[in-house]
């Protein structure tokens, strides 16, 4: 079992390998970066409360006027090459898993955009991004910008900034300490992490002056020792629910601690969404659940869905990974697996919540609708 963050790190490593091979072949700079599979940086003043996925506080009834386009091409669901572990979250109850996903089942959506994955950002554009980031944070003393074959970077004695096709990150060679009253450690409580988020937002506010940003305090699952953890990110708010969904899925900024609870890295997701295929009609969560029980889903979980299984939670998310050709919206269903493979954890009431993905666009637009065949797909 691997968490989202562990799977993401592995995907990042593989995408860099893929990008390097493509770069050598085409003599172009193609960079690789963190990849969001589900499910995993930016800022202003007011933070809403963060709450469980189906909390009563997350019952926005926003609707979108976005209509489906006509003459849309069919889409292909690409298969992974394996080796990523399965996506499972260890918790006593689904309510412990939290995030600030703006979607909920009360929101009416007729269509959502689909994008073709692009990994061809020019080296000059990436250099420009590094320069802009350094200026915003008032970082100085950088040498020339270099290309290591999978990314473009510049570094000083204390900081390294790296830009790729899908993100930019600021790495502190000597991690930044927070004041003693803040707990930013791996296993800090929800309350402590929320306080740390406010401090970090204020300290690095230069990054986030273009609007209001929402705190996405996500996580709540445990490791095999029963230790709960949360993670800090931000995404830009919008009055348009579709844009808000896009911002949440593609343009988050994360603050990452080291083992000592010090700030080690700030990274912002910036994938290129310039190649839009079109606005595709979206099915309802109920229709997606029918497809789920028909076996038409993508999962890394080791077991098939049974008719008797109950879904614990539903989310709308975009997936993107090295093997994907398109950024497509999916419904992500969580299903509890009582057997954790660890007797001690089971005695403590832990379950593993496995993730199953059903394409959210109408089935007729999927050229190869996934069908679970007993193997990791």
Residue ranges of model-derived segments:
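Preferential activation on post-signal-peptide N-terminal prodomains/segments
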Residues: 50-246, 250, 270-277, 372-376
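Short coil/turn linker and secondary-structure boundary residues
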Residues: 2, 6, 121, 188, ...
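Alpha-helical structural motif
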Residues: 4-7, 129, 193, 284, ...
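Internal signal-anchor transmembrane helix that establishes type II topology
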Residues: 23-45
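Segments that shape or occlude catalytic/ligand-binding pockets
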Residues: 194-331, 335-344
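Disordered, charged N-terminal biogenesis/targeting segments of membrane/secreted proteins
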Residues: 1-25
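A short, surface-exposed beta-strand/turn
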Residues: 162-173, 243-268, 339-377
